[in-house]
Each structure stands twice: as structure tokens, then as C-alpha cells.
Design a protein with these regions (language model features):
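Extracellular receptor-binding modules and their adjoining Ser/Thr/Gly/Asp/Asn-rich linkers
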Residues: 1-208
């Protein structure tokens, strides 16, 4: 039995209560060839990007991966375990994505943080972050250095730290209880307090 951390953000551009920007959207017809996705917002610096396949058009397990992330866009493509399934070049999927401005406010325990962690591979790497009550942690590769499909696994979650590593989803390795040796990747880590995330849309007025 495993614990699953998740986050859901309404489509559009929002401001977190600490001033950071978060943008959520979906992209249709994502294939195994990279396509560029525009945020529709110009971040002040490169954000972290989280993606997830939101359809089942290929009929088997596929993963979505961001790469070439800039302050205004990123490239998006599918990956699958070619040794088990082969690669269906005609398959397309719908992918949901969230872009989060990096940083956070150390004194605001409910708002968490977003950061990019460099040089993560198949061995666990400890990551510290601003103290966040009831932390929910989402992590995803931000680069595509290794050729094998892989996910980021989190472990040892506390209110100010987590361990991350790259886990390859190769069927034959998994069947033998083994883990592949993966290349170093940049990993985006987003931390939120469990519960509703207070966001403000464009034009929101706050009376005090």
C-alpha cells in the first residue's frame, strides 16, 4: 500500500497569496514527438512544470514529460516502456499541466514552496523546504536526459524535507524487483499544505 500525493488547480492563471503565479491548463493530441506549449503567461524566471496524462488513447501505460522549460513555454511529449509495448507513433493523449513560480515564504507555513533540484538520479536525494504543515509534495522531472521512461518517487516526507529519486518503469526490471540506473535529471518539487489552496484570479479585489 502506498500514499499518493496529488494537487488539482482550476484551469487558468492565478496568484497564490504569497504573490507567486500558478498557471494550469490542458493540451490535446500530445504524441511521442515533442510539441511546444505556451503558458499564456510570462513568468519572471523558469517555473517548475508538473504534468499528468488525462486520457487513455494508447491502450497501455504512458507517461508525459516536460522539457526545455523557459519562462514562457515548455516542450511536452509522451513516453512508454518500448521493451514491453513498443512505441505507437500514432497514439495521442490529453495531458494536464501546472506551472508554478519557484520560491516561497518561509514564515507562511500554509503556503509551501516550489523549487528545482539538480542532479537527481536513481539514488535517493534529500531535499529541504520551508516548514509546511501537513505537507503535500508533488515532484516531476524537468529534463529528459535518460532514454527510459521514469517517474519521480518521494519518500521520508516530513514538514520540512523529503527524499526524491528517479524510478524507471521498465517492465522487465520491475518484474525482477530491480531498479534501472538513470541519468541525472533536474526535478521540480512543489510543496503545498493539505487542503484548499487559496488563489486569486485576474481582477480579484480584496477589501481589508
Amino acid at each position: 500500500m502506498e500514499d499518493i500525493h496529488w494537487v488539482a488547480i482550476e484551469r487558468g492563471t492565478h496568484a497564490l497569496s504569497d504573490g507567486r503565479t500558478i498557471v494550469a491548463g490542458t493540451t490535446d493530441n500530445v504524441s511521442y514527438s515533442a510539441q511546444n506549449v505556451n503558458f499564456g503567461h510570462q513568468f519572471s524566471s523558469k517555473p517548475i512544470v508538473l504534468t499528468n496524462v488525462a486520457s487513455h488513447g494508447s491502450g497501455h501505460l504512458v507517461d508525459s514529460d516536460p522539457k526545455n522549460i523557459t519562462s514562457s513555454s515548455f516542450d511536452l511529449q509522451l513516453q512508454s516502456d518500448q521493451k514491453r509495448w513498443g512505441q505507437n507513433s500514432t497514439a495521442v493523449e490529453k495531458v494536464g499541466w501546472i506551472a508554478i513560480e519557484t520560491g516561497g515564504s518561509a514564515g507562511l507555513r500554509q503556503l509551501g514552496e516550489a523549487k528545482i533540484v539538480s542532479a537527481v538520479n536513481h539514488t535517493e536525494k534529500d531535499v529541504s523546504f520551508n516548514t509546511t504543515d501537513d505537507a503535500v509534495i508533488i515532484a516531476e522531472t524537468q529534463t529528459l536526459a535518460g532514454p527510459d521512461v521514469a517517474n519521480v518517487t518521494i519518500n521520508n516526507v516530513t514538514n520540512n524535507s523529503v527524499s526524491v529519486r528517479i524510478t524507471e518503469t521498465n517492465y522487465h526490471l520491475t518484474k525482477r524487483g530491480e531498479h534501472g540506473h538513470h541519468a541525472y535529471e533536474d526535478v521540480g518539487v512543489a510543496i503545498f499544505k493539505k487542503g484548499l489552496i487559496l488563489c486569486f484570479g485576474r481582477g480579484t479585489e480584496i477589501l481589508t
